[in-house]
């Protein structure tokens, strides 16, 4: 190992990964993913789909998850800066409904590993950001789930100024809270 540093988070399973960066007068080189290094760090997943999105400042995406086809995700920022959040939705977890957030940026080059059964979202802090992520299952459009980003029962402390007008999809504006989600899982 030695090519990555792995920081465990307060919520079991979440990990912040910092790669080794090798720079000189030409620029830099880093491995964004090496199966052997990640396996040695306890992240032994097979990723089957890579995605990339671009967003402008104050875009908030999330909080998303797949219900019947949950995905582990490895997320990073290629350009710009975001505040990235995961919310524990694992049934029976001692930290169910708790959240963890981390700044991911092109400058700090950190990555965030999010296990299955977490809701995930981010807000763009820079003027523009490109966001890339690997998933362990394919996207299933009919299996989308979500929780509203500002659910007071979760209490995410988004680093956005009061009164900031967020840019969100209509779908993300309509998600219910974690209580509604929990109730729907009990009944469904």
Where are these regions (language model features)?
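Non-catalytic, conserved peripheral segments adjacent to functional cores
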Residues: 1-107, 126-128, 135-188
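Short beta-strand His + acidic residue motifs that chelate non-heme Fe in jelly-roll/DSBH
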Residues: 112, 120-125, 133
